[in-house]
């Protein structure tokens, strides 16, 4: 992913974050650090769970594609994050399931005097069939 300038952030312009396919090992390692529930870290517990197998922690898909897709494009423009809202987990994400992500600025409020802008980013993550698995909004203060 190439670095993009703040000027390229336009309301309703969608940016592709790429695709992530998590392995069972990815799910277990992430969960051990961030969400150590049995059905994320123990094979037998995962198979006996509601999900009948390993599923990613709710935050893992966002964190993965944010790190590999969004930060390389826009990280250099960030002053700080301000809010995270409306995080919805619609479908479980299993190991070996490819998930694609996009980020779309849904609101941009520039302050020329202070040389910053508040941007509300809408994130969508979909499975290979195009079904939403997760959505959220993140409000970020950007340098302009």
Model-identified regions with their sequence ranges:
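HotDog/MaoC-like acyl-thioester-processing domains
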Residues: 1-11, 89-144
